[in-house]
């Protein structure tokens, strides 16, 4: 009874124009934007955003390459020609090009005020100036109490050192003139090297004693202590060498004894 009607067959309120003419694309009809699309898929009743945003400069290219998804510029803040259109989200040029409007990812460090920096640096500068302008006698008095205990402590440590009594160290006492206090050192009566037949490598004459005329002289006392330590080290090395030489002689004698015993029982020398 009723025939099937299409939406495009209805007339609009613009004076009898068809729906297809009313909803046609506002783009220039000279170029067919759907030429690259099959006719079965193309529908002139729909309007795409790209067709609405086409301007005259872009109509010089074919419809298939006018606006593509890969090569065309971005429609959002992509060209000054699009500034007249209200395109969502409508990012302006100033919003993207000015880095001052960007929010900081990390909290900004508060700079130190210049006045506070001057207040903090002023006492240090004043203290340095006072130290530089301090008279020389006051500096000597401020340094002397710290040096004097060091001298006394050094002399006491050298005199109380356990290595001092066993070495030839002579210290001239201040009130005894040229009298010398010499440590009692008794050299060993016999040497192990002479018994083992090893030649002695020590000095024929004893080393001269170490004399310190001024016990308050820190440099002289330190030099004497270093000399004593060096003599003790050389003495220990010499004794160790003599012990090793004696051990070698003992092993050689034992080897010769076992060798002669083996030869007496008919062992071959090869």
From Swiss-Prot:
**Subcellular localization, as worded in the UniProt entry:** Nucleus
UniProt record, GO biological process: amino acid biosynthetic process; positive regulation of cellular response to amino acid starvation; positive regulation of transcription by RNA polymerase II
Q: Where is this region: Disordered?
A: 114-135, 153-213
Q: Where is this region: Leucine-zipper?
A: 241-248
Which keywords label this protein?
A: Activator, Amino-acid biosynthesis, DNA-binding, Nucleus, Transcription, Transcription regulation
Compositional bias (Low complexity): 184-195
Q: Does Signal show up as a keyword for this record?
A: no
Report the residue ranges that make up the bZIP domain in this protein.
216-270
Q: Name one GO cellular component term.
A: transcription regulator complex
**What are the recorded GO MF terms, alphabetically?**
DNA-binding transcription factor activity, RNA polymerase II-specific; RNA polymerase II cis-regulatory region sequence-specific DNA binding
Return the annotated region ranges for Basic motif.
222-240
Q: What function does the entry list?
A: In N.crassa grown under amino acid starvation conditions, this protein is required for increasing the transcription of the genes coding for many amino acid biosynthetic pathways enzymes. This transcription factor binds and recognize the DNA sequence: 5'-TGACTC-3'.
The protein here is known as Cross-pathway control protein 1
Name of the gene:
cpc-1
